[in-house]
Amino acid sequence: MDVFDGLPDPIIVDILNKVGDVKTLLRCSSLSKRFNSLVPQSESLTLRLDHSVSDSPVVTSIFRSLFNGLVSLLSKPAKPITITTLSPSLPFKILSRFDRIRNLDVELPGGDVKLEKGAAVKWKAEFGKTLKSCVIVAFRSAGTVSSPVAVEGESDAEFVTGLKTRVVWTISALMAASSRHYLMREVVKEHEEIESLVMRDKEREGTVVMNEEGLKELRNTEARVEDEERVVKNKRSVVPSVRMSMRHAPSLKLKSGICLESATLVIVRPSGADFEVGDDAELATEAFVGDCMYGEAVVALLKCKKNALEMNSF
């Protein structure tokens, strides 16, 4: 007798939840009739996807149309942004075998934001029917220093010099986040039992999260026809008009001995959202809690001068 034959179904399902990986579970379903009936009952899944990418020329028009008062600074054409073009039908079909999903983690093979060598962008976005918030930390290069010093603010000239790069980082992150949100729309609406959704790439560059409230909001909201047309055309969810709090340090020396050049913290919220002055710190620190270098950078950058920007929907 096989060792599994003596185990009750709930224990087998619990073991399958520990396995988690969707491809492995689908292989397990072919082992026997019993496994074929129990695998679809798995509640905690990890779906690893391959995807193709394409260059999006939309960034140039975004620069020219979304930022009031910055056209002269951003007149030089920007390089295309690389975004995910994976079809939403793929995860939908793969997960169609499962009918009790409660917690879903989705992993893409690589990040969406393409940067010059040495630069890094890390972001975390929360969604409901649309973007709720996004926190972005970026820097041009990282090195070590012999002794940490206090963080200083920046001059207006320093802010203007690096503004275009910081805007590129921000738009890249928002486009990547909205592409991932679009990717899972069909899955969220079909699997009403899902209570938690987390999407990240293997490099841990960007993370999209949806909690139970946000998932219900997406399922219960009917998009306007014109918005739906934009979504299908662009293969990503519409980014609403947003307000951004941007903080920047030309050289950020951390207590850990790491020095970040052109370090930037951007906190993005929808224009109509209500929030208190102190909410920036709470949102940013929670986004990178447990992430040593980025968490330390957030704390340091929150002490820098804040610059406010507004961006139209795109």
Curated annotation (Swiss-Prot):
Pfam families: F-box. One of its GO terms (cellular component) is nucleus. Pathway: Protein modification; protein ubiquitination. Keywords: Nucleus, Ubl conjugation pathway. Residues 1-49 form the F-box domain. It is found in: Nucleus. InterPro entries: AUF1-like, F-box-like_dom_sf, F-box_dom. Induction: Not induced by auxin. Component of SCF(ASK-cullin-F-box) E3 ubiquitin ligase complexes, which may mediate the ubiquitination and subsequent proteasomal degradation of target proteins. The F-box is necessary for the interaction with ASK proteins. PANTHER family: OS05G0510400 PROTEIN-RELATED (PTHR31215). This is F-box protein AUF2. It comes from Arabidopsis thaliana (Mouse-ear cress). The gene is AUF2.
